[in-house]
C-alpha cells in the first residue's frame, strides 16, 4: 500500500496553518488546479506566494502540463503579477527532454524526435539542440489520407529515434496515424510526458495527456516511459538541481495519483492536497491501494493566507 501513514490533517485555523508553514523550507507547487484554473488565478494565489517569499521559503513549480515551455510559463506567471524565473519551473515536456538527453543518450544533430503534442515539447527539445517533427506542424491539421500525407508519401524519417507524446488539444486521426507508424518501429523509443487522465478547467473536466498517450499505447501494443509526476526521475533532478533536503520539502498539488504520490514516494517531508482542482475530501481521507493520502489538505491554497492573516 502506498498510503501515507496517519489521518490527513485539514488546515482550518491559524494555528494549523502556521504549524504547516513552519515545518518546511521548500514548497513544490503543481500549477493547474492549485494556483489557477485555466486563465483565472485562484483567490489569494499572489498573496500566499508573496507571503512564502517573505518567510524565506524556496518556491519551485512542477507541472505535468507539456503544452507550454518553461519560458511560456514565466509569461503566464507574469500575467498574474507573479515573478518566477525559468529555472524555478519544471514541466513534463522539459522532463521528457532531459530524459532523452540524460537517460536515452540521444544525440542532438543526429537523432530526431517525433512529437505528438503541442509547442511546449518542441521548444524544450530545440533548446537542447534536438530537431523535432510533427507537434504543432499545421500540415497535421488536414484530414488524413495515407496517399497524400506529407509525413508518409516519401516514407518515414529514418533519423527519428524517439516519439514523445503529450497532451494535444488538436488531436485528430492524422496525428494518431503518423505517430503509430513510428511506434511500430522497435528502434524508436516511446516517451510519455505524463499520466494525467483528465484536467479541470472552467468548471469542467477534460481529457488529459494520459488518455491520449494510452490510446497510442493500445494501438502500438507498447508501454511508454512516463517522465512527469509521479516519476521519480523528475523529482531526483529537482533535488539535485537545488541541493534540497527532502525532509524539509512539501509537495502541493490537486491530484492524489500524481502530486501526492510524487511527494510520498519521493520521501518528501510533507504533502498538501488542495481541493480546488480534481479531488474531493472523501477521496483525500480514503485509504486506497491506488494512491497515497496527503499529510495535510485544504479547500484552496489561498486559505493559508487568509487564515494566517485573519481575513476569513
From Swiss-Prot:
Any GO CC annotation of this UniProt entry: cytoplasm
- Disulfide topology: none
Q: Give an example GO molecular function.
A: alkaline phosphatase activity
Q: List this protein's GO terms for biological process.
A: carbohydrate metabolic process
What catalytic activity is recorded? 4-nitrophenyl phosphate + H2O = 4-nitrophenol + phosphate + H(+)
Q: Which residues cross the membrane?
A: none
Please provide the record's keywords in A-Z order: Hydrolase, Magnesium
Q: What is its EC number?
A: 3.1.3.41
How does its record describe regulation of its activity?
Activity enhanced by Mg(2+) ion but inhibited by Ca(2+), Zn(2+) and Be(2+) ions. Inorganic phosphate and ATP are competitive inhibitors, whereas pyrophosphate and AMP have no effect.
SUPFAM superfamilies listed in its UniProt record: HAD-like
Q: Tell me where on the tree of life, at the top rank, the source sits.
A: Eukaryota
Summarize the protein's role.
PHO13 is dispensable for vegetative growth and sporulation.
Subunit field text: Homodimer.
Extra remark beyond the main annotation: Present with 2980 molecules/cell in log phase SD medium.
Q: What is this protein called?
A: 4-nitrophenylphosphatase
Origin organism is Saccharomyces cerevisiae (strain ATCC 204508 / S288c) (Baker's yeast)
Amino acid at each position: 500500500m502506498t498510503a501515507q501513514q496517519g489521518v490527513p490533517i485539514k488546515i482550518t485555523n491559524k494555528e494549523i496553518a502556521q504549524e504547516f508553514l513552519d515545518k518546511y523550507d521548500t514548497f513544490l507547487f503543481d500549477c493547474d488546479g492549485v494556483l489557477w484554473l485555466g486563465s483565472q488565478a485562484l483567490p489569494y494565489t499572489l498573496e500566499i506566494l508573496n507571503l512564502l517569499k517573505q518567510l524565506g521559503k524556496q518556491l519551485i513549480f512542477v507541472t505535468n502540463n507539456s503544452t507550454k515551455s518553461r519560458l511560456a510559463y514565466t509569461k503566464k506567471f507574469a500575467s498574474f503579477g507573479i515573478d518566477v524565473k525559468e529555472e524555478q519551473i519544471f514541466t513534463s515536456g522539459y522532463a521528457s527532454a532531459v530524459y532523452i538527453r540524460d537517460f536515452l543518450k540521444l544525440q542532438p544533430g543526429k537523432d530526431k524526435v517525433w512529437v505528438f503534442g503541442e509547442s511546449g515539447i518542441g521548444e524544450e527539445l530545440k533548446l537542447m539542440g534536438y530537431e523535432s517533427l510533427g507537434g504543432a506542424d499545421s500540415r497535421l491539421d488536414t484530414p488524413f489520407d495515407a496517399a497524400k500525407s506529407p509525413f508518409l508519401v516519401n516514407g518515414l524519417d529514418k533519423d527519428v529515434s524517439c516519439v514523445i507524446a503529450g497532451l494535444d488539444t488538436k488531436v485528430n486521426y492524422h496525428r494518431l496515424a503518423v505517430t503509430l507508424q513510428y511506434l511500430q518501429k522497435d528502434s524508436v523509443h516511446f516517451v510519455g510526458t505524463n499520466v494525467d487522465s483528465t484536467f479541470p478547467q472552467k468548471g469542467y473536466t477534460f481529457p488529459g495527456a494520459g488518455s491520449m498517450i494510452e490510446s497510442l499505447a493500445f494501438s502500438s501494443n507498447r508501454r511508454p516511459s512516463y517522465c512527469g509526476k509521479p516519476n521519480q526521475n523528475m523529482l531526483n533532478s529537482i533535488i539535485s538541481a537545488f541541493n534540497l533536503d527532502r525532509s524539509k520539502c512539501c509537495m502541493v498539488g490537486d491530484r492524489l495519483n500524481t502530486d501526492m504520490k510524487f511527494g510520498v514516494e519521493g520521501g518528501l517531508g510533507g504533502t498538501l492536497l488542495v481541493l480546488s482542482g480534481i479531488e474531493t475530501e472523501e477521496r483525500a481521507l480514503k485509504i486506497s491501494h491506488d494512491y497515497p493520502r496527503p499529510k495535510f489538505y485544504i479547500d484552496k491554497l489561498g486559505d493559508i493566507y487568509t487564515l494566517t492573516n485573519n481575513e476569513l
